[in-house]
C-alpha cells in the first residue's frame, strides 16, 4: 500500500458558524464545497482539511497544523480575532491550542530546532 495524501475531518454542528471560524483560521474561504454541509481547505503540502456537519461527533475532533513560525502565525490569527486557549513549549514542539465554536481542538505546532 502506498499512501499518497490525507484528508482530516472535523465534525461540527452548524456549518455556517464553523465557516466563519475556519475562514479566519485559514485566512481564506474554503477551496471546495462538495456538499452543502461540507467545506474543504487544501493545505500547501497537498493534504486537505474537511469541515462537515455531524452533530453527534461535533466537538470531538483534533487537528494539528505544523507551522514554520508559531509567533508569526499567532500574530496573523490575532488579527482575525482568534486567541489561543493555551500555549506550551516542550522538547520537540512549541504549541498553541485553539477551540472552534463546537469545542474541536486546533493545535498549531512548531518543531524545535534539530528535532524534525
Predicted regions and their residues:
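N-terminal beta-strand motif that seeds the catalytic metal site of vicinal oxygen chelate
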Residues: 1-19, 46, 61-65, 112-116
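Conserved active-site tyrosine of GNAT-family acetyltransferases
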Residues: 18-23, 77, 103
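Conserved short beta-strand elements that form part of the metal-binding/catalytic scaffold
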Residues: 28-61, 105-111
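Secondary-structure boundary/capping motif
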Residues: 13-21, 38, 48-50, 97
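Vicinal oxygen chelate
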Residues: 5-13, 55-116
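Conserved acetyl-CoA-binding loop of GNAT-fold acetyltransferases
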Residues: 24-31, 81-83
Amino acid at each position: 500500500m502506498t499512501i499518497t495524501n490525507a484528508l482530516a475531518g472535523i465534525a461540527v454542528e452548524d456549518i455556517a458558524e464553523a465557516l466563519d471560524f475556519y475562514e479566519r483560521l485559514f485566512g481564506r474561504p474554503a477551496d471546495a464545497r462538495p456538499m452543502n454541509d461540507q467545506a474543504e481547505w487544501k493545505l500547501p503540502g497537498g493534504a486537505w482539511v474537511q469541515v462537515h456537519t455531524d452533530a453527534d461527533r461535533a466537538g470531538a475532533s483534533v487537528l494539528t497544523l505544523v507551522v514554520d513560525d508559531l509567533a508569526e502565525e499567532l500574530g496573523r490569527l490575532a488579527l482575525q480575532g482568534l486567541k489561543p486557549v493555551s500555549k506550551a513549549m516542550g522538547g520537540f514542539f512549541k504549541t498553541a491550542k485553539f477551540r472552534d465554536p463546537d469545542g474541536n481542538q486546533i493545535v498549531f505546532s512548531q518543531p524545535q530546532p534539530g528535532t524534525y
